[in-house]
Amino acid sequence: MLCWAAKWTDKRGIFSRSKGDEDFLTCLHALLNEADAVVHFNGCKFDMPWIHSEFLQAGLLPPSPYKQIDLLRTVRSQFKFPSNKLDYVSQALGIGHKTKGMSMDDWKGCMGNDEKSWKKMLSYNKRDVALTEKVYFKLLPWIKNHPNSNLYEDKVIDKMRCPTCGSEHFIARGNIATASGVYKRYSCNECHHWFRGHEQIAKINVKNKTSNV
């Protein structure tokens, strides 16, 4: 792993470090230790295993548990694009495109500690992070099993809020039936996610049945 970049979704700045930095791994470890959830694109199979391998070899313990939101999994399960690559998806959604790819000479330059090559590498990395965040917000209404943001609040929540983005602005739109009962269904005005209320408005009674085989 030559470098990494990351940002918080509610802040502007992008963190980045390269292999030669003294806190190359400890800074990343601290960020993951603080994170409730990590958004990435194919990170479950690629980025995170590489990062964990670096941590292990450096003698670092696992950071505190965090949820993973892999946008590639959402793209594959919910849509059918000609290509599932971040560059294609971001352009298809009108967000923008990745920085022009790194050439073999650029990679060799980084290995040889060439300043110009490193600058290009970090710029490429930061652009990927910026695109990933924008794609995340575009895909947000479609993401299944998104972590409940209300569970990570420091204060007590005394109002019903959207479990995905925490907004208090939503509207009731019909009911939803589950195996245990019927609940009010809501649509968030901010992230446009669907969710259900906590209280049952009707209970389903299931009778015991027997059958002969």
Task: Report each predicted region and the residues it spans.
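Residues immediately within or flanking Cys/His clusters that coordinate Zn2+
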Residues: 157-160, 185
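Conserved DEDDh/DEDDy metal-dependent 3′-5′ exonuclease domain
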Residues: 10-92
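Short, non-ligating residues that shape and space the ligands of small metal-coordination modules
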Residues: 168-174, 197-198
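Short metal-binding segments enriched for Cys and/or His
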Residues: 189-213
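RNase H-like nuclease fold core
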Residues: 1-12
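Short linker/helix segments within small regulatory modules
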Residues: 175-185
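Acidic, Mg2+-coordinating catalytic module of metal-dependent nucleases/exonucleases
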Residues: 39, 88-155
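Short cysteine-rich clusters marking metal-coordination/redox-active sites
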Residues: 162-165, 188-191
